[in-house]
Amino acid sequence: MGFLKGKKGLIVGVANNKSIAYGIAQSCFNQGATLAFTYLNESLEKRVRPIAQELNSPYVYELDVSKEEHFKSLYNNIKQDLGSLDFIVHSVAFAPKEALEGSLLETSKSAFNTAMEISVYSLIELTNTLKPLLNNGASVLTLSYLGSTKYMAHYNVMGLAKAALESAVRYLAVDLGKHNIRVNALSAGPIRTLASSGIADFRMILKWNEINAPLRKNVSLEEVGNAGMYLLSSLSNGVSGEVHFVDAGYHVMGMGAVEEKDNKATLLWDLHKEQ
């Protein structure tokens, strides 16, 4: 018997079969969940529908989180098709490319507002819209990153957005706790995804994480997906308001091992020159 057998969940923001949302969806499906998916626009619909089909789901809905009317349509569609939900996965983040270049000082008000609206407010609006459909014991999960609390090169305004997102998780956990609904964030280590492709020097970031993380590796999509499934299932019934790291332990590190520093410096300089 799967940990999510008989449960119904909504996956918001899956982009392709390399995305973290896909890894979570696949793990939930393997544990017996019935899934529904959203897509941003017609271009991404062509990617999402095959994923939904692979995971035996006929439920695919359009959702541009910048459009209020889409939330209303989503609510009506889910109520009609599924009746209720046991979990929501929020995997939505965006900042204009120019806001990830240069320094934070150069961030425009427009780029800042866009990053906050799409990456943070969308979680609040999504949860509030679908709250009447959430069953007792339901779970809401969003995706964060270490850049929320530590400086990460080329992350800029997204670091601020992820910090705000994690704060929203804590406040939503309190607001929804009285309804026995849990809210958590999953903070994964670097993984090659469509979103990470927009970050400069990402190959170097991957290698740096691999050689400095306590487990001396980068995490896999399956590992992150299984952690997400845990936070959505009854296995984590006592967990809410948490930021759960799945990064091979990298978040605990200060400096790497002294005996390795020379090799690391040479390796990273070589990687940097290849960019």
Swiss-Prot record:
The active site is at residues 145, 155. Its EC number is 1.3.1.9. Keywords: Fatty acid biosynthesis, Fatty acid metabolism, Lipid biosynthesis, Lipid metabolism, NAD, Oxidoreductase. It is an enzyme of class 1 (oxidoreductase). Pathway: Lipid metabolism; fatty acid biosynthesis. Substrate binds at residue 95. NAD(+) binds at residues 13, 19-20, 64-65, 92, 162, 191-195. GO terms for biological process: fatty acid elongation. PANTHER family: ENOYL-[ACYL-CARRIER-PROTEIN] REDUCTASE (PTHR43159), ENOYL-[ACYL-CARRIER-PROTEIN] REDUCTASE [NADH], CHLOROPLASTIC (PTHR43159:SF2). This is Enoyl-[acyl-carrier-protein] reductase [NADH] FabI. It comes from Helicobacter pylori (strain J99 / ATCC 700824). The gene is fabI.
